[in-house]
């Protein structure tokens, strides 16, 4: 990464980006475990070690080839002002998600993120995205919302992937803290240890093309599907 990756971003813009990636930004992510709760139900994840193994697998597959990669692809498309390609990636990533609740949860988070960002900042390209979602022409994905937002702010692609990844990790760990449960300190240790994986993945994503978009690990998808019929649960997905 650059020595100063935020050199072209004003302090005001940087703080506005930080606000969006903060785990307290109310977009509903805390309602979703994306299959982790099924691993709890089946006693596959029972403690901090088990959770960390699950998170590493999630980041290395569903995040890397999904939300992480789509941020890179959106940046590539926006460099040539190709919004039609962005809308195409929205459709590919959505239809590649096998679990119904995960698809629905992702769309709900995207809509809420769009609603909040537009109330705060009113960015034209996000107006276009919001309009297409309302018309049913695209589905909505929070990583695409974020990518369009930070591209508009002048943030670099690698930094965008890393910051979005941090937001995902932070939220998932907080969900694990209350669901497993984990201690707050154990949770923060997991967040810290995840940074090396996130940095490595950010670099690897730069070498991927659109043919990888939506690839996933069957075990994660099956857990997300089984969660849909789980009787007792804390999370919507």
From Swiss-Prot:
Cellular compartments per GO CC: cytoplasm
Molecular function via GO: nickel cation binding
Localisation per UniProt entry: Cytoplasm
Name of this chain's protein: Urease accessory protein UreF
Main subcellular localisation: cytoplasm
Species annotation: Streptococcus salivarius (strain 57.I)
Gene: ureF
Keywords assigned: Chaperone, Cytoplasm, Nickel insertion
Keyword Coiled coil carried by entry: no
Keyword Cytoplasm listed: yes
Subunit structure: UreD, UreF and UreG form a complex that acts as a GTP-hydrolysis-dependent molecular chaperone, activating the urease apoprotein by helping to assemble the nickel containing metallocenter of UreC. The UreE protein probably delivers the nickel.
Functional summary from the UniProt entry: Required for maturation of urease via the functional incorporation of the urease nickel metallocenter.
The family this protein is said to belong to: Belongs to the UreF family.
């Amino acid at each position: 990464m650059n020595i100063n990756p935020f050199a072209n971003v004003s302090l005001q813009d940087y703080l506005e980006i930080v606000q969006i990636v903060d785990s307290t930004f109310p977009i509903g992510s805390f309602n979703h475990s994306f299959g982790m709760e099924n691993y709890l139900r089946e006693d596959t994840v029972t403690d901090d070690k088990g959770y960390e193994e699950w998170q590493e697998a999630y980041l290395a597959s569903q995040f890397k080839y999904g939300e992480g990669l789509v941020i890179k692809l959106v940046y590539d498309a926006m460099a040539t002002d190709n919004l039609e390609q962005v809308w195409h990636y929205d459709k590919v990533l959505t239809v590649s998600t096998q679990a119904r609740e995960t698809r629905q949860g992702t769309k709900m988070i995207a809509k809420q993120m769009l609603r909040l960002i537009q109330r705060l900042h009113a960015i034209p390209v996000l107006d276009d995205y919001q309009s297409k979602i309302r018309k049913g022409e695209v589905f909505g994905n929070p990583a695409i919302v974020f990518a369009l937002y930070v591209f508009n702010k002048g943030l670099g692609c690698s930094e965008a992937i890393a910051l979005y990844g941090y937001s995902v990790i932070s939220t998932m760990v907080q969900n694990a803290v209350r669901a497993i449960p984990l201690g707050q300190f154990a949770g923060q240790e997991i967040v810290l240890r995840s940074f090396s994986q996130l940095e490595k993945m950010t670099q690897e994503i730069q070498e991927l093309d659109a043919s990888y978009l939506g690839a996933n690990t069957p075990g994660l998808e099956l857990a997300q599907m089984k969660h849909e019929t789980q009787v007792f649960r804390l999370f919507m997905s």
